[in-house]
Regions:
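Acidic two-metal-ion nuclease catalytic site recognized across multiple nuclease folds
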Residues: 102
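Catalytic core segments in nucleotide and nucleic-acid processing enzymes
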Residues: 1-97
Length: 102
């Protein structure tokens, strides 16, 4: 598994990023998928609420992932913001998966 590409697609919330950070403790090559600012902003009509946000530092996130995590953790857009992965549009998912093949 350590020689394989690994993609992680979780909810865009503080817990989703915490799980990504934990995964990278075992599989440091894991790449996030559809957990970026563009995905979050494109699906603003489907935002939900995260009742209890993670507050700890996540040292295994990339700079781009950390920017989104900090936005969520610090309530920069709104308090408790989250986007559940199942709320992301199918067309967006299909396009993102197709981009992996290139």
């Amino acid at each position: 598994m350590h020689q394989r590409s690994v993609h992680y697609w979780g909810d865009i919330d503080t817990h989703g990023f915490a799980m990504l950070d934990q995964l990278r403790a075992y599989l440091p090559q894991a790449q996030s998928l559809m957990m970026d600012e563009g995905t979050l902003m494109h699906h603003s009509d489907h935002w939900g609420h995260e009742a209890q946000a993670q507050q700890r530092d996540l040292p295994r996130l990339t700079a781009h992932e950390h920017a989104v995590y900090d936005t969520l953790r610090d309530n920069r857009l709104r308090a408790g913001l989250r986007l559940e992965q199942e709320r992301i549009g199918f067309g967006w998912v299909k396009q993102s998966l197709a981009a992996l093949q290139k």
